Amino acid sequence: MLPPWHCAKLPTGKPDVAMQEASHGELRLCKRLQLDAAASSALLSAMRAGDSSRSAVVLTPRAPQDYVPPFPCEDMSAAPWLPPRVFVPQVGEGLPKPTAYEDYRSGMYYMLDLSSCWESAALEQVPTPQCSLDLCAAPGGKSMLMAARYLPQNHTANEVNAARRGILRQNMEQCGVPNVTITGLRPDQWAAEGKLFDLLLVDAPCSGQSLLCKGIRNPGCLGHAMVNGNAKRQKGILLAAVQCATPGAHLLYSTCTYDPDENEKVMAYILKRVPGWEAVDVPTLSPFRSSLADFPAYRLLPHHGFGAGGFCCLLRKKA
């Protein structure tokens, strides 16, 4: 059963207003997601409003175990999936921003979108890794969330783009993430390296459709060309990633887009193409389980109230 906030966020007025104003690409997306009229209207309205972004802070290894953020935070008891050491700042007139504090500048906490925290909730099903690889790591959010859950023993944060790799390095150093190596190899180069990991993170490049719900222009993100191009790239990254996995390893795949071609269909392709892998059930994410897959996969939409949205699926290589 969906939690109370799921229905509470849906519009109660006429659901056809947003539908009448929607573009062909927007209507196509709603159809592909198999949304009913109310959910379609909620998604389209969020794209128009551009105000679905919701910030979170993750405490870094620099913060003591008993550290409490110096700003007021939301009660998140209705979100049992919330990862450890993650807080959601209160927002409103006169409330200070988390970035205004010296603790932020000294690396006690790291700012990111709440949707990213939701995607990392699947790591609750993963035992502490001995050797982990974040293949698409910049600017560092997923590596930071992993470090908050269990301090990495031997972690590699990889980013191909040199400029983004510099930002990644700066964030890892500022936040004091230990035992981390910054690299810039392509996924196929990692596959050729022969080094094996028991946890792989693939926060894949995508069409970024959720940016529209944050008020960020993203021309072409609903079009066939961008979606299909990203889906092809994502499959290539994953086909390389699975070659870097030990028996029993986990792979967390995530995106910040909605289209099934970049999400459920990519996962279905990998599960069919690569023998010996299975999707893992994540009980705390069960209210978000996708109806577009016959295996455990999870999607977040803006009307859920936890940010602009995203997708995640946890895979395990059979021992």
What kind of region is each of these model predictions?
Residues 1-319:
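S-adenosylmethionine
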